[in-house]
Amino acid sequence: ESAIEQEVFGLEMGYGLLVLADNKKGGDLLDRITGARTNFAREMGMLLPTIGVRDNIELEPNEYRFLLRGKEIVRSSIMPDRVLAMSMGGGDASKLNGIPTIEPVFGIKAMWVPDEERRNAEVEGCTVVDPSSVLVTHLADVLKREAHLILEREGTQRLLDLIKDKNPTLVSELLPDLVNVGVIQRTLQNLLRERVSIKNLTIILETIADMAAVTKNPDDLSEQCRKRLGMYFVKEYESEPNKLLS
């Protein structure tokens, strides 16, 4: 069964990066990945499957890559024995003695420098992070970017089950008479594709229920959900009617 069932999302690393995941050597990468999954669920409202982490001898020692259903979607590298000094906040990493690179998420010019150069980098005004932070930040960005492809029928059903525990009337109104799970999945995927959080799932499902008599097209439904969510988002930031906080 395990041979048939394909892993949804995975991380593969070259052997030089394994020290980052070895807690006996002070590596906390696995804990950070768990934290990234938790933060993603809290921010985007989507339950993530377990992220498989393994070594791959075909990668260069300091390389890593993310896979979606077994297919590589991005590859990068970090230096486990150095820290990354980035040209942020007015700092200029090019003045430092190190190995030049580009930070993978923000595209910022950066320099891999020995840890003993951290203080000098900070004096130069650079932002300095450890290699595990670079990888986990990259992971978080990729998860958001690919969330719509990660969400499967089963994951959608799990979200519906969570809502059903608190709001059984809403779910029973929707399923199976108004729409099926596939329509809800594709509607949620449309929102996630635009990096719209689905954590306000009750509002989304209520909108689908309201509109289902008119249209069952996921594109139309997601557009209406986006508008409804936008109304609630604005209200959160209003200090008084029709006036946004400055």
What kind of region is each of these model predictions?
Residues 1-246:
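Membrane-embedded alpha-helical signal segments
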